[in-house]
């Protein structure tokens, strides 16, 4: 049974629906990421759930209680924002203990909880530190500890890693997920970073222009984007328009650079008449190598027009007729990759099991 259910939630500013008939549910202990570009309504939606803004219509049901008239102070939700809002005049201990003191816990209980939380976030021994002297990553971990200290029934995080550099973001993503899963608190996590959402979420709610575009697990959303917006936002590069064809022998897709044979292991529902070719599903060969390939299905002559190294993989930009495609390769153990230069003629073979439709 869902712990949180949002039904037809709508909020407008100056007749503009920034949250437009949004509905989804969250299971107990689940991490749900609200993902989308800036201005898509995800932060406003979070503020509606927190009680910091009033919605125009719809329902928010949490543990069978309608929150329509429940003020933010009575919701027992933990909040963590990008700008941290740590109290600069309080040290680390006092910041984390703040919510516990508001709930009138004993000093002994507060001491124990703060100590446990500092250990959990990897900052044991930092209790007397000035928060202004901590690094950005350390401040984020203190903010997380403060948010979960009062044992909230729902944890809400709004772009908590947005101000950090990419390396620190990557390490803290893992740590935040581990901590949240360890304590078992249901969480709503807002981000515009697709990689962050794919790493942290149990479920992704993809938004654009105030509406939900798609809901699913990270794998479902990434492998089967609902439309071209979803595909592009999730980082897919080879998005091809065309027409699905089928006969007794195979299923194919006719597009700008030719006929592509599709896998008979995959069901293709091409509402947008488009396919995605995963960059990892394109192999490149010299002419001599291509001459030794048994099947010529999905084999195309191409020209290498670009080459770069990105995130432990080589990317080749190739031109097949007038279509530009990206092929990526992980170097093998010895660092070897296809020996192909810009301007060189080559052959591209597409693995049909790396083609997705939408």
Range-by-range predicted roles:
Residues 72-78, 82, 86-229:
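ABC ATPase nucleotide-binding domains
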Residues 58-66:
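Conserved ABC transporter NBD signature motif
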Residues 50:
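Helix-to-loop junction immediately C-terminal to a conserved catalytic motif
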Residues 247-358:
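Non-catalytic connector elements of ABC transporters
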Residues 56-59, 109, 209, 241:
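Conserved coupling/switch loops of ABC nucleotide-binding domains, chiefly the family-specific signature
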């Amino acid at each position: 049974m869902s712990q949180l259910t949002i039904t037809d939630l709508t909020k407008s500013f100056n007749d503009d629906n920034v949250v437009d008939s949004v509905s989804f549910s969250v299971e107990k202990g689940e991490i749900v990421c609200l993902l989308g570009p800036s201005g898509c309504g995800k932060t406003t939606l979070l503020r509606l759930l927190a009680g910091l803004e009033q919605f125009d219509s719809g329902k928010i049901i949490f543990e069978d209680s309608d929150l329509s008239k429940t003020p933010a102070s009575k919701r027992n939700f933990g909040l963590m924002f990008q700008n941290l809002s740590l109290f600069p005049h309080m040290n680390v201990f006092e910041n984390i203990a703040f919510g516990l003191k508001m709930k009138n816990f004993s000093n002994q209980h507060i001491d124990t909880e703060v100590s446990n939380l500092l250990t959990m976030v990897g900052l044991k021994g930092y209790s007397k530190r000035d928060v202004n002297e901590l690094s950005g990553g350390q401040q984020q971990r203190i903010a997380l500890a403060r948010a979960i200290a009062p044992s909230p029934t729902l944890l809400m995080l709004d772009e908590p890693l947005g101000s950090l550099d990419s390396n620190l973001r990557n390490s803290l993503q893992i740590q935040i997920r581990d901590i949240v899963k360890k304590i078992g608190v249901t969480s709503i996590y807002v981000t515009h970073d697709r990689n962050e959402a794919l790493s942290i979420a149990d479920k992704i709610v993809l938004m654009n222009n105030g509406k939900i575009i798609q809901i699913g697990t990270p794998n479902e959303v990434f492998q089967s984007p609902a439309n071209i917006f979803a595909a592009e936002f999730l980082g897919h590069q080879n998005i091809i328009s065309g027409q699905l064809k089928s006969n007794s022998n195979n299923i194919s897709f006719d597009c700008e650079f030719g006929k592509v044979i599709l896998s008979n292991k995959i069901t293709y529902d091409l509402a947008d008449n488009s396919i995605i070719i995963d960059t990892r599903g394109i192999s490149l060969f010299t002419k001599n190598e291509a001459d030794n390939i048994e099947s010529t299905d999905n084999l195309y002559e191409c020209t290498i027009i670009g080459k770069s190294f990105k995130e432990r993989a080589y990317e080749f930009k190739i031109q097949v007729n007038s279509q530009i495609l990206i092929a990526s390769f992980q170097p093998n153990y010895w660092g070897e990759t296809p020996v192909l230069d810009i301007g060189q003629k080559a052959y591209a073979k597409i693995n049909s099991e790396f083609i997705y439709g939408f």
